[in-house]
């Protein structure tokens, strides 16, 4: 009877592990606000990301968030946030683009000027040579090139 029970528990644990779909890797959570308004606070799947001042981000990390290893198509997270008065809570489900769980440094959330929210699991930060967000939407200020900011720093406030 004990052997049958142990076998049953072993099968149950195997089944639960298969449903989970793999191991996880824990990394820091960081936000970037590309908009003109503060984000009162944001969350990713219930993990608190904190306050984001307009046109700021990347300077503060919160611990921690787990991502699946390995990545697989269709992975999504629920991003929640409030407005600059910490009111009007909203949520959006966002797909996680492909990442290499062996080369992660942070889980990045971007609140973009066009209203989109994008997430990435990169090794480095915004403006770094391999950072996935590029082009006009990448700058924290309109017209700003984060690669130049990453290389030389921000030359004063552009407000």
Language model features with spans:
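Structural motif
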Residues: 29-38
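Tryptophan-paired
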Residues: 42-88
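Flanking scaffold residues of small Cys/His-coordinated metal-binding clusters
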Residues: 11
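Bacterial N-terminal signal peptides that target proteins for export
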Residues: 1-8
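C-terminal motif of bacterial Sec signal peptides marking the signal peptidase cleavage site
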Residues: 14-18
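Bacterial signal peptide processing site
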Residues: 20-22
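Structural beta-strand segments of beta-rich domains
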Residues: 25-27
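Beta-strand-rich cores of mature extracytoplasmic or soluble domains
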Residues: 82-159
């Amino acid at each position: 009877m004990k052997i049958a029970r142990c076998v049953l528990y072993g099968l149950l644990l195997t089944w639960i592990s298969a449903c989970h779909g793999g191991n996880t890797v824990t990394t820091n959570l960081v936000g970037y606000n590309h908009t003109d308004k503060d984000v009162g606070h944001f969350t990713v799947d219930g993990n608190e990301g904190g306050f984001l001042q307009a046109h700021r981000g990347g300077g503060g990390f919160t611990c921690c968030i787990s991502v699946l290893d390995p990545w697989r198509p269709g992975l999504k997270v629920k991003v929640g946030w409030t407005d600059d008065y910490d009111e009007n809570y909203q949520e959006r489900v966002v797909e996680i683009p492909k990442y290499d769980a062996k080369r992660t440094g942070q889980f990045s959330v971007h609140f973009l000027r066009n209203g989109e929210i994008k997430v990435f699991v990169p090794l480095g930060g915004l403006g770094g040579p391999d950072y996935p967000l590029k082009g006009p939407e990448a700058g924290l200020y309109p017209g700003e090139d984060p690669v130049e900011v990453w290389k030389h720093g921000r030359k004063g406030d552009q407000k």
